[in-house]
Design a protein with these regions (language model features):
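N-terminal glycine/serine-rich phosphate-binding loop of ATP-dependent small-molecule kinases
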Residues: 1-86, 134, 183-186
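Glycine-rich phosphate-binding/catalytic subdomain of phosphoryl-transfer
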Residues: 55-207
C-alpha cells in the first residue's frame, strides 16, 4: 500500500509517500504568509493553507493519508461550518493582550499560556462579542483539514489536548462556549485517536 504522509508545519507543508517502508516523492512548499501579523494577532487565510496542501496532494496517488499539523492553532466557524475567523496560529498572543487568565487543570494535559486556544477564544468573547455570538463550531487546524476531506470535525487527542478543551483522563471534550455546545473533538477509546474514514480530494484516498 502507498501511504501519503502530510506534515503541515509553521515553515513548510511537507509531503512524502511511504511504500513498503521506503520514503519517496518527497516535496515541500512554504506555509502561507500571515494575513495579519501585528505583534499580537497572527492569522493566516485557511483557504490558502488548504489550497497549498491539496495542490500537491491531489497529484499523488495513494491508498490512504496520514496528516500531522502544527498545534495550538484554531479557527471559529458558523452553524454551517463556514469560517468566521482566519486560522489563528500558535504564534498569536491575543489572550495576553486581553489579559485572559484561566484555570487549566492537569486533566487538560496542558497549561495556561498566551497561545492556548481556549484562552484565545475567551479573548475573542471579550474583545469581539459580535463575532463570538455567531460562532457555532471550534476547529483545530487538523480538524478543519479533516472536515474539508470528510465533512467531520475530528482530530487526534494529542491535537485536541493542545486546545485546552480536552480532558485527557476521561477522553471527553469540554464545552467551547460556542453555540452548539456539543462535542467538537472526538476520540475512540482503545487506540488513542480518531478513527475516521471518508473520501475527499486526495485522489479518492482513505483518511
Amino acid at each position: 500500500m502507498k501511504h501519503l504522509l502530510i506534515d503541515i508545519g509553521s515553515t513548510n507543508i511537507k509531503f512524502a509517500v511511504s511504500d513498503g517502508g521506503a520514503l519517496s516523492e518527497t516535496e515541500k512548499t512554504p506555509f502561507p504568509a500571515p494575513a495579519v501579523d501585528d505583534g499580537v494577532h497572527f492569522e493566516v487565510e485557511i483557504s490558502g493553507i488548504l489550497a497549498k496542501t491539496f495542490a500537491i496532494a491531489d497529484k499523488i496517488d495513494s491508498d490512504d493519508v496520514f496528516i500531522s499539523t502544527q498545534m495550538h492553532g484554531y479557527l471559529l466557524a458558523d452553524s454551517r461550518s463556514r469560517p468566521l475567523t482566519r486560522y489563528i496560529s500558535w504564534q498569536d498572543r491575543r489572550a495576553a493582550e486581553a489579559q485572559v487568565r484561566l484555570f487549566v487543570g492537569k486533566e487538560s494535559g496542558t497549561s495556561m499560556k498566551d497561545n492556548l486556544p481556549r484562552a484565545g477564544v475567551e479573548a475573542i468573547r471579550k474583545e469581539q462579542p459580535a463575532l463570538f455570538a455567531q460562532a457555532e463550531e471550534f476547529f483545530t487546524l487538523g480538524s478543519f483539514v479533516a472536515h474539508a476531506l470528510t465533512g467531520r470535525n475530528v482530530t487526534h487527542i494529542t491535537d485536541a489536548a493542545a486546545s485546552g478543551y480536552y480532558d485527557v483522563k476521561r477522553r471527553l471534550s469540554r464545552p467551547t462556549r460556542c453555540g452548539r455546545r456539543r462535542e467538537l473533538l472526538y476520540s475512540q477509546p482503545g487506540h488513542g485517536g480518531a478513527d475516521v474514514h471518508g473520501r475527499g480530494r486526495l485522489c479518492g484516498g482513505r483518511l
